[in-house]
């Protein structure tokens, strides 16, 4: 259900990925949310955090896709609850934007997280500990909706 996508090291990474994720053709219901940023200015605000802490090199963001099987039935409200919960998980330290894409046979959520902490500038590492922590959180959230984690 979750898929990491891409390396985002160039200066246009924030703008390119966020523009793709929030494309109105893919998000006709406007199901876009975020934490620690204004969704209309997410790319600029993420870039500003990286600039303030002089962390403009290496991978700039995490782009994760949470995809639901066409066999799984889940209402839009449930998808948004799961996306909100995942955004909340990272919100203590990071800026997060999500967008629910409805342009395919199955809905999916694009999550974009600034790898630079807005609080103190530390960089998200994506360690095994972090991976298993978010995985456990996601499994718990999915169970609330009668879904399961498929990876």
Residue ranges of predicted features:
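N-terminal nicking endonuclease/strand-transfer module with a His-rich metal-binding environment
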Residues: 1-151
